[in-house]
């Protein structure tokens, strides 16, 4: 099945024992006879609104691997793989300014805004960089070759063809890409660590594990790794570029608004009064939340962070997005051999103008 509005169809394989599958899934009607594909899909996904399935079947939106259109009378076949378009959730309108930083026949680089997810996930399907770009560029083959957190802005790279995907993804997997981020946070409180980050590059090495269902990552510092015989798997070079006075209580960041955002007054660490620092972060690995977790470990969680040091209610705050931007990306083009240097034009809201 082709994409629809930039969104891929979803595959689902019918289980060998539909009754057991319905029982495990907690269906409202686990013992209902399953004679047709429609019977199973209604019982499994929409027992209280079967019209959703029957309407899809009438529109020819549920098909087999070979493109055969299923109907309400199509018999249930264990092991059959079917394809369908997911029901899209109601999504708030997110920023869609994705200026092109670089493009050739193999790859497209854009400057992602804060709050926009890279790919469909959870509550966001249409409102993602991938979906928006597939529609805008008219290219259903676009695929990101790396990821940025939804809250992070900056340089984001997409492969434009199927052969290019493997080449660029391998480049990232082999750590052949130079990456540099900018962040705003409080100065590191430990005098020795702060002095190291001011005079040169402070290296942070930890072990990071992302547990399914947990919002924050689990992290072990170097002494903990040594005690528990764990291997560090996350390394970041941290440099403080400058220290400056934090804005006053009436400061309003010059940050674009977006429809559907819910603002809360003090996301992440408080930023009024005292001092802030501009950090240059160079990750040598690519673990989930690595930069956010490493600055939190140093006692300087990134301003605007709603996950570290503690999880806050999920809400977008356009006046103070996470103060983290993927600022630079450099690599040797795997096809042309050209040295490609990309730089984000995004500005962090808390930096002095």
Kindly label every feature range from the protein language model:
Residues 1-353:
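RNA pseudouridine synthases
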């Amino acid at each position: 099945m082709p994409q629809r509005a930039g969104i891929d169809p979803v595959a689902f394989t019918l289980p060998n024992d539909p009754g057991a599958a319905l029982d495990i899934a907690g269906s409202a009607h686990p013992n209902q006879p399953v004679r047709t594909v429609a019977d199973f899909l209604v019982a499994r996904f929409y027992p209280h609104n079967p019209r959703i399935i029957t309407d899809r079947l009438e529109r020819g939106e549920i098909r087999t691997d070979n493109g055969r259109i299923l109907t309400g009378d199509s018999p249930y076949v264990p092991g059959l793989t079917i394809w369908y378009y997911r029901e899209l959730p109601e999504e708030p309108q997110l920023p869609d300014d994705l200026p092109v930083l670089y493009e050739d026949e193999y790859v497209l680089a854009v400057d992602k805004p804060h709050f926009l997810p890279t790919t469909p996930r959870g509550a966001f399907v249409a409102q993602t960089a991938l979906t928006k770009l597939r529609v805008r560029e008219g290219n259903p083959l676009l695929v990101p070759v790396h990821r940025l957190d939804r809250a992070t802005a900056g340089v984001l790279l997409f492969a434009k063809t199927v052969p290019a995907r493997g080449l660029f993804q391998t480049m990232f997997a082999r750590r052949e890409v130079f990456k540099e981020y900018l962040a705003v946070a409080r100065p590191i409180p430990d005098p020795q660590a702060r002095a190291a980050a001011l005079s040169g590059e402070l290296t942070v090495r930890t072990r990071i594990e992302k547990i399914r269902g947990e919002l924050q990552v689990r992290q072990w510092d170097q002494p903990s790794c040594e005690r528990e015989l764990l291997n560090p798997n996350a390394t970041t070079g941290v440099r403080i570029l400058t220290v400056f006075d934090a804005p006053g209580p009436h400061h309003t960041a010059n940050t674009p608004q977006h429809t559907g955002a819910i603002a809360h007054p003090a996301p992440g660490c408080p930023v009024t009064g005292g001092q802030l620092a501009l950090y240059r972060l160079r990750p040598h690995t690519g673990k989930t939340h690595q930069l956010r977790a490493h600055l939190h470990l140093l006692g300087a969680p990134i301003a605007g962070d709603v996950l570290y040091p503690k999880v806050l209610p999920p809400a977008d705050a356009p006046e103070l997005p996470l103060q983290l931007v993927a600022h630079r990306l450099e690599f040797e083009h795997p096809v042309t051999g050209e040295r490609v240097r990309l730089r984000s034009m995004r500005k962090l809201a808390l930096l002095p103008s």
